[in-house]
Amino acid sequence: MTKDFLFEIGVEEMPAHVVSKSVKQLADRTGKFLKENGLGFKEIKTYSTPRRLTVLVKELDEKQADVDEVKKGPAKKIAQDADGNWTKAAVGFARGQGMSADDIYFEELKGVEYAYVHVQKAGKEAKEILLGLDEVIKAMTFPTKMRWDSQDFEFVRPIHWLVALYGSEVVPVEFLDITAGRKTAGHRFLGDSVVLANADDYVEALRDQYVIVDADERKAMIVSQINDLVNSHNWQIKLDASLLEEVNNLVEYPTVFAGSFDQKYLEIPDEVLITSMKDNQRYFEVYDQEGKLINCFISVRNGNKDHLENVISGNEKVLVARLDDAVFFYDEDRKYPISHFVDRMDSVSFHDKIGSMAEKMTRVRIIGDYLAKRFGLSAEEVADFDRVSGLYKFDLVTQMVGEFAELQGVMGMHYACLAGENENVSVAIKEHYMPTTAEGDLPKTKVGALLSVADKLDTIIAFFGAGMIPSSSNDPYALRRYAYGIVRILLNEDWSLPFDQVVPEIVELLSGKTPAKLPQGAEEDKQLADFIRDRIKQFLQKNNYQYDVIDAVLASSEQDPSQILAAAKVLQQHHDDEAFKPVVESLTRIANILKKAKFSQASPVDPSLFEDRSEQDLYDGVEALANVKDHAELYEAFVALQGVIDRYFDVNMIMAKDEAVKNNRLSQLAAVNDLAKRLGDLSKLVIK
């Protein structure tokens, strides 16, 4: 027999961002607890609001299965001494099964007598086992925790009640000074407490008390109400998923409403308005049918429609106060030229151990000018880069960014545009922060992409030079994200940048031109280059490349992300082709022969030492590949050459007795292997 089991932890209001993760954690830990205690169940449903974390275990077994099994122990000669007395090994074996040594008997197995016990144990009742759920509560972890009253225990918020019902029966789980019962709390202002008769009454009983405990249902209500409101006014809305999730976890009974503000505030940049509404007030911004921001917002109340006009008025007043501040900052900042803010960069610290923002901008210009030549930017683009690299951090000391830090770069773009800077310069100020998240949008302009790469590369070089290198578990300055951003931009722009070559050259360029400490020596340069290169794996994984393809291309000595990606594309594309297996096997055979022969000093191949036409054919084939740059073309050439390679092995003894012939043939194979290594370490490919 089975019954449903309800377990609710009632708390003070939790921060919205922890609710979903916390209820998932509760479900995972509860499921683990039940499995470890031998209780089967169909599934675990989760319910959550800011005031409760709940699991409903469907079809939970009433008891553990009875145990009736034979356990094998040590051999008889170990279980008993010469006088027939039980040894410690025997006593320990029996005790481990909940038995005594007197319960041991012996049976022969393959000519050897072993100790056995027959274990028979009645399974425990589910109600008895569930009393141990206090351990689940104790095991839960949170980003921040609180203590309350005189308790020494910490939880995400103080716990005020517990509900534990197995079917209709209370399971009196005890935690601190609380004993679980069948009484739960309705909405803080609209509902009353509820006495649950049965675990399955939970959802509907709380609905009657203005609590929608199903987070998915609550979210659907919000979306439906928003759509009704938007359609009735002929508006448009960008339904931000993360904001919707946050708002959903702020309410127990959602009611959507719209508010408005004076049109004069539309004169400030859209991003300021959106930040004020979305980030500060948790409002959804509203657009007209042409996609233009209008002076309205949508929000969600934790309650019903009673006195909704007062709620709307209160929210409008709060937003207007915020917007008045924004207008003041905007007007104050525009009183000064950009040079006024740039002059203050000397007093803005990038990092105590590295130097000022002014010094950083100087380094970034040097790096960017070097990269611009490699990337082939036009003279106009280089001029725009030189201009923007001398001012791009200026908005950090504006009043607007001082109040709205999330607008750094954005306000710089707007202020630069107002000051008459061209579009390339203005937009690059915003784009140099991109991508702002691991998979965020990339710069759309060449100048912005160059500035972003140069700025991120400088940051990584500076922190490595100062000895602040990320560990496997700690990256406080997000250097891995910066490195991944560099890789994504390079690949998006199809810019070639072999890190092993570029890093030492940049460090040399910066030497003597900055007070910041730089990486010292080839070993530190390599460590830094490898750190950035390692982010290519993240890119390939994100783009669903097969694990063996990733292993193969990253095992090569290639440092240029564009070349590594090109190789990965070819191997991925042809991985399941009929020709792939024989080609890879032939090339891998060559690599293995060279490795076994410990052959590393290849000499130019001497055709005069050839003894068979197959050697000349392979020589001609390799010569034809010497100038092939495209990886796809290289692979196709290997497919065409595969028969030649096989004939070469069929006819020729590689390890010939004649030393000159042997070395010549190994040199031939080394020439093939050098070309194959452009595709990666093919031995790591899994071929069938």
UniProtKB/Swiss-Prot annotation:
Entry GO CC: cytosol
InterPro entries tied to this protein: Gly-tRNA-synth_bsu, Gly-tRNA-synth_heterodimer
EC number: 6.1.1.14
Coarse class of the protein's main subcellular location: cytoplasm
Pfam families (alphabetical): tRNA_synt_2f
Catalytic activity of the protein: tRNA(Gly) + glycine + ATP = glycyl-tRNA(Gly) + AMP + diphosphate
Biological process, per Gene Ontology: glycyl-tRNA aminoacylation
GO MF annotation terms: ATP binding; glycine-tRNA ligase activity
Keyword entries, A-Z: Aminoacyl-tRNA synthetase, ATP-binding, Cytoplasm, Ligase, Nucleotide-binding, Protein biosynthesis
Compartments, record wording: Cytoplasm
Membrane-spanning ranges: none
Family statement drawn from the similarity comment of this UniProt entry: Belongs to the class-II aminoacyl-tRNA synthetase family.
PANTHER family, alphabetized: GLYCINE--TRNA LIGASE, CHLOROPLASTIC_MITOCHONDRIAL 2, GLYCYL-TRNA SYNTHETASE
Subunit composition and interactions: Tetramer of two alpha and two beta subunits.
Classification via NCBIfam families: glyS
Protein name: Glycine--tRNA ligase beta subunit
Native organism: Lactobacillus delbrueckii subsp. bulgaricus (strain ATCC BAA-365 / Lb-18)
